[in-house]
């Protein structure tokens, strides 16, 4: 919704929690508006055409000195995080579009948003899918198009190697990878060249994967 709202304005900026998600959104904006209209700004990548009108950024990299008609910040509940929370809190307090501002996140942020912005319109949207416990499974017996979430780089690589030995292939997605490598790994999985994805829990922050 935020992307469509942004593209309905003459200029816009969106702050996202993950570099990989920023790249995904950037590709969508380029497809809709062309390369000259879109900028990608993260801690690792900067693609900034001179006359760009839409800025897709990680939250930390948002150029707040630039006035835009529409501004959105995604996953504002990260304001509670001990490491990154101060940045999200600053954006929640100060980042605004001069025509429209959209703050997206967990319903747990409703009381805080209501206190800070008493006139804000709060819209609750139901999740498009449900999460269900399927029981214990051996990793080597998982069905194709499965994603495995691990919580350290060592576990990610170990599980990916296990899947490669027994099932033929797995893509790896972690924040520690270079942008080019991350994007290539996502493409491998999305294009069906491998049937398994092994990632850190960061994929739960809005990445759209065909799992």
Task: List the predicted regions and their residue ranges.
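Helicase motor core with emphasis on the C-terminal RecA-like subdomain
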Residues: 1-73, 77-211
């Amino acid at each position: 919704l935020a992307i469509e709202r942004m593209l309905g304005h003459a200029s816009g900026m969106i702050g996202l929690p993950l570099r990989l998600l920023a790249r995904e959104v950037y590709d969508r904006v380029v497809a809709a508006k062309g390369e000259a209209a879109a900028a990608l700004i993260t801690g690792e990548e900067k693609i900034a055409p001179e006359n760009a009108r839409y800025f897709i950024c990680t939250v930390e990299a948002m150029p707040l000195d630039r006035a835009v008609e529409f501004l959105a910040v995604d996953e504002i509940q990260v304001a509670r995080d001990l490491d990154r929370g101060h940045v999200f809190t600053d954006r929640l307090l100060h980042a605004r579009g001069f025509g429209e501002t959209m703050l997206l996140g967990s319903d747990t942020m409703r009381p805080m948003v209501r206190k800070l912005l008493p006139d804000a319109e709060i819209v609750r949207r139901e999740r498009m899918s449900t999460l269900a416990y399927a029981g214990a499974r051996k990793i080597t017996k998982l069905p194709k198009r499965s994603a495995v979430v691990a919580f350290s780089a060592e576990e990610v690589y170990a599980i990916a190697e296990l899947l490669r030995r027994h099932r033929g292939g797995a893509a790896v997605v972690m924040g520690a990878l270079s942008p080019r490598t991350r994007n290539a790994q996502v493409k491998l999985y999305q294009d069906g060249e491998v049937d398994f994805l092994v990632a850190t829990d960061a994929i739960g922050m809005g990445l759209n994967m065909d799992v």
